[in-house]
Amino acid sequence: MAFTPFPPRQPTASARLPLTLMTLDDWALATITGADSEKYMQGQVTADVSQMTENQHLLAAHCDAKGKMWSNLRLFRDGDGFAWIERRSVREPQLTELKKYAVFSKVTIAPDDERVLLGVAGFQARAALANLFSELPSKEKQVVKEGATTLLWFEHPAERFLIVTDEATANMLTDKLRGEAELNNSQQWLALNIEAGFPVIDAANSGQFIPQATNLQALGGISFKKGCYTGQEMVARAKFRGANKRALWLLAGSASRLPEAGEDLELKMGENWRRTGTVLAAVKLEDGQVVVQVVMNNDMEPDSIFRVRDDANTLHIEPLPYSLEE
């Protein structure tokens, strides 16, 4: 029997989040194992996986030949290969693309639904987990493994942990934390990723953007020194010829409805409104605020005003916790 997702509650911004345990049911795990795993992934993703240590996780992109992302992957070493976490809506097509050249290599690429993905965030998240594991990951050591469990550490928007584990441990954690922690589903983790400026690629936006249009270069997800990988030429051209004119932005404000992934927004131009951008993800918080992650031109004025199409309410730009200056 699969681990049952927790019932949803309205998500909360990181600054006010009580201790919360989340099921990450909208995310999914996949793995590559076998003697050629590292070499194979090195030829497929934007990050330099050969330089990754056991204690690192990276956000990398898997692109098509034109440099457009099938998906982005939260990648870490796992067993004799690698595991990655991506949006569940893109896992199957992403794995289909990744397997295309695998027949020539000693690798096995597969979805992993045996393990459970949990998130822990909010007030004193570290203290709550310290009683349950002998070591927790940190800035210096961002991945820690203990038994069947892998713990990933995230700094933004506030310290939080992603736990990859077996069902028995997931049940144990739920039992131990149930009293002190709120339980929530993956919408809360999504809200934190939006706040952190981590790009969310769902099926509607797969194959649409080069990595730099979603700030991946600012998140350490692209190596410009490594050897060939699928889409490299276009990704390099965007950097060295200044071909990328887009960036990922965080908007906040109000809206009478949540915009969907793939939808555009409207930008105020004097008395008029002009369509702009592509929404990657949006969430309504418990205080009524709407947060939207959107890809738009990278030269937007900081005081620009936006709205969901034809809406009476407005959205404004919020700062991201990282710089886009190279």
Swiss-Prot record:
Keywords: Cytoplasm, Folate-binding, tRNA processing. GO terms for biological process: iron-sulfur cluster assembly; RNA modification; tRNA processing. Folate binds at W27, W189. GO terms for molecular function: folic acid binding. Pfam families: GCV_T, YgfZ_barrel. Folate-binding protein involved in regulating the level of ATP-DnaA and in the modification of some tRNAs. It is probably a key factor in regulatory networks that act via tRNA modification, such as initiation of chromosomal replication. One of its GO terms (cellular component) is cytoplasm. It is found in: Cytoplasm. Belongs to the tRNA-modifying YgfZ family. This is tRNA-modifying protein YgfZ. InterPro entries: GCV_T_N (IPR006222), GcvT/YgfZ_C (IPR029043), tRNA-modifying_YgfZ (IPR023758), YgfZ/GcvT (IPR045179), YgfZ/GcvT_CS (IPR017703), YgfZ_barrel (IPR048451). The keyword Aminoacyl-tRNA synthetase does not apply. Its main location: cytoplasm.
